[in-house]
């Protein structure tokens, strides 16, 4: 194992209680003692609180899905995010980068033009971007 990819820290968004926040910190602190890198997937509410109230010694990177793109599960279609959503995630990732984190984006798009736009957007902001044409991240359809 060369690092941890930690999912579900967005539980703090659903249950914004100090006990949840402290519990996530405890888990991350335990992982940090291994000397391995820690990348959080999502969890923007937790990460923003942590980075604005603590000295960042736990998080090496953050991954955010759907910064530029979006997936409409009800219609089963890939789309682009609206400007306000894009700006929100951009501010979040920029905050993380300003605290020493590497920012990753995971986008979902099939349209070649949207894929190029998403990659260019990530590159312009200094994010490492992966684009999948499959919401399930499967290799084959």
Residue ranges and their predicted role:
Residues 1-141:
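Glycan-processing catalytic domains of CAZymes
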